[in-house]
């Protein structure tokens, strides 16, 4: 609409300018005298022509524009321009002539006659008229050409404006159509937003309907598939029946109907009976399941009750163990005080101290600090002895020692101080417990090693006994000595125990700890082949006498070593769980000197002489009863594998029916 308004304003301005130009032209025509009629006529003619042209041009606005008139107008305009150029030149020439004539007239007026003047005036008048006419024609032509040119320009502008108006109108129509479409779309969108819940509800309903249809279709498919399977199974059954009937029809050796019916009746009765049995068994299974479930529930309840009872008992056991530990600590504290008092007593009496070697110090450090109660419990932890005689003597010695210590304790407890620091008590207790644990571990390792070695030796010698032929060798043992020697041995052992207790009180102020009697070394006899193998010689090589000499030499060494060890440990009261005898051989002299000095200080010089005289006899007397006890509990054809000090070449072999009990002879299988 804005473009149309602009076009209207432009058209109005154009027509206003044309009217002004026409007014100017009319004023110019009125001013020019004499030429008014000609100009009017020419204007009228031109107006008529222009009117016709304007009509033609207005008619052509709707259709197409005539470019031929423009061509003609251009040609006329060119001619008019040429005339415009020629006219001023002619005018200048005429002016010059007119001026020349005036000058000539002024100079020679007197000479010219009147007639000549009349003719000359007429010619001048005619020339002037002609000039004025030419000027009027030129002006009129010029005015007409300018008007035509302007009219044509205005027509062209009008045509352009009409084209623009048409384009703008079409654009407006298209824009109106688009606006209508947009308005419709916006209205639909707004309506859709308002109708969203309805649309969603419709969509959900459609989805539900489709799902129901799917389910129905799936159910139909399933039913159809089942029906197809059933029909297939029926077809197969019918085919089987047909085949069976065909075979029956083809068989010519069939029985009669009565027999077949009788068989069928029997089979049906059996089937019925089987069905009844199956039903009864199913009922029994159900009943049994119920009964078992009840029993399981009862048993679970019992187990829960037992678990609760066990938990309560465990709690009680823990409380009791704590109480026992507290009592043990109290007893240990009392023992610690007693040992301290003994130490103080010995210090006051100026008891002489004896220097000890490194071996003795190591043995004393290994000894644990135990209480009175632990002495009773650790009797069972001592490694098992090879004979009953050793066990009996060990138990007797322990009982005697415990009684002596129990007699000494009440005298010492009366002298204890009533107030002691708690820190010292607990430190002593922790130290004792640590030493006990260390000793138990050492003993357990020693026992395990001994057991392993004994088992290996058993296997080896059983194989050797199976492979080698038996040879009987008579070994003559010394006869038993008198009961006085046994009494001396016991007294000697008691005194050695007392001496060990005094040494412990002097060194560390703790309760003494002693093991049972010593293990005895076993003496074993081997064949020449085994002896040669032990010495690195071939089994068959070497004379028999050399083997016997080696055997006798080795047995003599073992006997001497055993006697020395028994003497030393009987005085010291300590027996290592595992080790070798080489250490004791090297330090034999120093140990004997210390032993003799201690015995002189404790019991006097006379006791040392008695012990020196009775030591070989005592050793023999102690060996004979122990060896005699070893032979009785073990059955024949069995060998005891326990040994002492890790000796790998020695095993005991039982005797076969001793020839006489008084002589003390034994026959040993090699």
Swiss-Prot record:
Bias (Polar residues) ranges: 38-51, 651-662
Coiled-coil parts of chain: 148-259, 305-336, 420-440
Region ranges (Disordered): 30-51, 374-393, 495-516, 557-580, 609-670
Alphabetical list of InterPro entries matching this protein: Lebercilin-like (IPR026188), Lebercilin_dom (IPR028933)
Biased composition, class Basic and acidic residues, residue ranges: 560-572, 621-632
Protein's GO biological process: intraciliary transport
Keywords carried by this UniProt record: Coiled coil
Gene Ontology CC terms: axoneme
Pfam families xref list: Lebercilin
Family note: Belongs to the LCA5 family.
Name by which UniProt lists this protein: Lebercilin-like protein
